[in-house]
Amino acid sequence: MLFAIVSYDKPDALERRLAARPKHLVWLEAAGPQLRYVGPLLDEEGKQRGSIVVTEQPDLEAARAFARADPFWGADVFATQTVHAFREVFRDGARVA
């Protein structure tokens, strides 16, 4: 089942984000095939303000555990983080569901 993890940074999190980024990238690489989409959320000036991760997990509990394992969470980067079930309807311009 797909889940969207939507996380918003704390206003003062940039230094912590940069420090934790190498561990965050290793965590993402280790997740490999579980990941569908990953990327930063940007503000009007193009600065990072959070992130979205769409991941394949067996259930909501597993998706929440996966989200909490993100090194950005442990580094106190995020102000909020929500996990939602997600259904992919279009991919690369083609309907898939």
Provide a role label for each language-model segment.
Residues 1-97:
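Conserved, structured core segments of small domains
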